[in-house]
């Protein structure tokens, strides 16, 4: 069993006899010298999707839930459900839009490296690859000779995500985005 300080985002844990997926973690450090760090976690219950905020001491042991990851590709939208297809055996997995709201900003039709997280036979979330490639739909015109400049400008991507990009990048270009930092990494390989 890992300590609370070792739990990562998107981990499946058991707490109060229920299985949760950790969506966000904030480390709180008390101002007193003897105070131990606290980890405040935003949890989503697997079966109902109910949100819960829980605090754990840094050295508190947390039981991880058994879950499986399967490689998937985005297939289509069915009402409020997003359907992902298993890349190996073509099993469809329906996931509610609210459950993967943050991840949707990085998922386009051709996004590769996605994995569905399955707990007790049901899909509970999507795990993103470290970087994804997306197309810029709108940004200010590029400035010739600006490659030496470190200045940036906002760019809206095909999924609606807005990131800062270097001035020499223009609309229609395909770029790599870090999914953990929400930042521009580089131009995509052609």
Curated annotation (Swiss-Prot):
One of its GO terms (molecular function) is translation elongation factor activity. GO terms for cellular component: cytoplasm. SMART domains: EFP, Elong-fact-P_C. CDD domains: S1_EF-P_repeat_1, S1_EF-P_repeat_2. One of its GO terms (biological process) is peptide biosynthetic process. It holds the Pfam family EFP. Disulfide bonds: none annotated. Belongs to the elongation factor P family. This is Elongation factor P-like protein. It comes from Pseudoalteromonas atlantica (strain T6c / ATCC BAA-1087).
